[in-house]
Amino acid sequence: MFALLASLASCAYYLQHEEKSFLSWMRSTNQFYTGDEYQTRFGIFLANQRLVKEHNAANKKFTVALNKFAAYTPAEYKALLGFRMDLKKRVAVKSTKKANAESLDWRDKGVVNGIKDQAQCGSCWAFSTVQAIESADAISTGTLQSFSEQNLVDCVTSCFGCNGGLMTEAFQYVIDNQNGQWCLESDYVYKAVDGICQFSKYSHVGSISKYVNVNEGDEDDLAAKCEQYGPVAVAIDASNWSFQLYHGGIYDESSCSPSNLDHGVGCVGYGSEDGTKYWIVRNSWGTSWGEKGYIRMIWKNNQCGIASMATLPFA
């Protein structure tokens, strides 16, 4: 009887301690729940807390943390992953060059904007497209501007706004229907919901004339084209919980698929640490996720499909 009471007391203490952690997490992420939803979110939080502790105790190349997605339902997380697979054959010409630099970071060259946040909208494809065009335009003109993701969410008829899309479709739409031009983010503000196309309402800037694909699955080609032309719009498999809760280090996830791609991001360079090569990948989940909004993904066997569907625009 005494043992049972001691066990119950220990369990109660554990839950009380963990609930304090959950309440602290809610305050830090500005996410508040009550009633039945509170209990549901608390359960998800506890499950992810166990995963985080087990993973970090294993001393892997990267760490995970209880970030703002730590109490997300699977459906909520999946809604962020808005890249829609394109089964059409892609045309790519392999670069005749190899990357010369041992490391490359386009952020150091003043042609990459700060991290943005797509919020609870599956518009990653629009953010992936825009970051590549912003950098291409900056490399061409010497002026870095912030272009409108909402322009794409509202206007690209071959994509589905907050329900997903393709970067190549967005590039083609801008070339065919907007004369390669763009609206500024300050004019056409991001709202994280689908709306009516208002491209004609605002003044237009920038210009892209074409885009080129990276040879499918070829990381050497990705490096060469990134060095030659600038940041790349890439699709990856981000479905794993370890990506959702990524905190820092070189992301090396053996269960990551090179072909089941679901998330649009940007590749702004590459480097190495202690002999391990990695890609510098820009996400659109705000600066509280990962390494101030970035993730370093291992350069090995096209893990997570980093080079499977990668595209670069030309200004």
Where are these regions (language model features)?
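Classical eukaryotic N-terminal signal peptides for Sec-dependent ER targeting/secretion
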Residues: M1-S7
